[in-house]
Amino acid sequence: MSFGPSLKKTPKSHWTDHPKNPLIAKKGRGRSLGSTWIWRAFAPEFRLRLASLVGNRTLYSARRLLQKIRGCLNGTLPLFTSDSLPHYADVLLELYGQWKKPQPTGLPGRPCNVQRVASPDLRYAQVHKERQGGRVVKVTQSIIFGKRRTVQTQAASLKRADGSEGQINTSYIERDNLALRQELRRLARKTLGFSKNRRELQHALDFIDAHDNFVKPHGALRLKAPPEGSRTWEPRTPAMAAGISDHVWKLEELLCYKA
């Protein structure tokens, strides 16, 4: 699928728990149990859930998530935003960086090694939140890759629900994380509905994301219906807004779709 250059991806992760049974762990089946993180990527313009990944809070998991996102971009480079986890910048440089040979200095000695630098089209900004007593007291935005004016202009093009200009933030993905907890029983806190292992949790996330993208219309994406029709609004799903689908899918269509 092809996305425009104004697309904004917001990687984010949140924590969940899989209670670990010591007897199961003793039998060698405990690797997929215990605490884990859910990594997610979201396109706010279309309210599209791009990828979800169950893993640890490591560089390896960040690489897997961004490789999934890369498969959705069809070669385009959007504006990336995230929290201040350093793994995102490292992996973005791996995937979208270029090797640059330093200019010779004319001085004696061993020449400098080639360096990995960001490509001119790569744009990435971070949001850092400082907390005191469990409350956010300060929010700082920093631009890691890209020109400041270009990043700010692209972020401002994303309109908020009240019509005001957007800014560099992670509020959309955080709100979608709340919706995900409401939709998926496995993520509910202090209940007996927890996942028993990571594999089943990953399958549940994939289904919920597909249902939200193709089956469930989003109120912020609806369009004004033609005056001759009986409807006031035409419902649209995130997949329709992104140009992936031309209709609202039924649940049966999703379950019977052959990938």
Language model regions located:
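Residue-level recognition of single "structural anchor" positions
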Residues: M1-A259
